[in-house]
Swiss-Prot record:
It comes from Aspergillus terreus (strain NIH 2624 / FGSC A1156). It is found in: Membrane. SUPFAM superfamilies: NAD(P)-binding Rossmann-fold domains. GO terms for cellular component: membrane. This is NAD-dependent epimerase/dehydratase terH. It is an enzyme of class 1 (oxidoreductase). It is a single-pass membrane protein. NADP(+) binds at Y176. Its main location: membrane. The chain crosses the membrane at residues 7-27. Induction: Expression is under the control of the terrein cluster-specific transcription factor terR.
Amino acid sequence: MTVSSSIVPPGGLVLVTGVTGFIGSYIANGLLELGYRVRGTVRSSEKATWVTKALTKRNPSANFEAVIVPDQNAPGVWEAVLKDVDGIAHVAGDVSFGPDPTKVITPSVEALRRLLEAAKKEPSVKRFVFTSSDQAASNRSTTREILINEDTWNEEAIEAAWRPPPYEAERGWDVYSALKAQVEKEMWRFSREEKPSFVVNSVLPTYTIGAIFDEQQAGSTAKWLLDFYKDPSKDGFMRGFGSSYYVYVGDVALLHIGALTLEEVQNKRLLAFAGRFNFNSWLEVFRKHDPSKPWPEDDPTQALDTRRVNGETELYILKQFGKDGWTSFEDSALKVLESP
């Protein structure tokens, strides 16, 4: 793909919310490498400083601007931020895993609505992409075969999240899943009913891995895996997480960039499901890479995720950026070890 064939013009300006996050930083870096300008939202001046330094170090001649947005629900917060923006990647989200849906889901839906309403008023905006999650489509399963497509929604999590109080801590995962589903649903409702001039798409990443972009980052899913590699005796979280699909963070970034820029990618839910894994899959890769470490034995109780997807559009997008398919599981896992 060349920038000249993009919906966003050469040197065009893309807003990336949550640019300091694991996925957000990779999206911003990929856009800068392609010659786009990037405006990224952060919550504090400290975060603005380190993310600007990290991105400009990799792209010395790039045009990156950090904008402080401490509260996405503040009235009028988006108007100035969106000035002259060609595309929006809305990556920022609540990752507190809080159990109270009124404190997690309700303000997140409102924040998205405010951003979309402001974007509708900005004539330069051509594309809007929301970073959703596989959990917006369905819970993980090792017993039921579930076909995931653009019409699949995690109604099970939504129902569980909104059960009456008390809001027990164990509800946090259902609330997170419902959050992603309900915010994404609101984006599609807005597009359908409000009919903005811009095209909307969403990207649904699964368990995302790769090198943490900067040492200042929490690292998200990659950090969990890195901690296990550094100390194999602390295997409780990765063992307990069990099975899902993985995806390399660089591939997730390319799907976002394709959703922002490719003419033919319109009104799509892009399913970033590269391949299945379970706890034993990590062990196989890490034993091969460093057999000297005291890796635990394989867990015979570990099954594999039984969800299925059809990833034709996703593979097409990767091909436009010169990639012949998803980054392999082994390569993706080993990239985590390149983290600062």
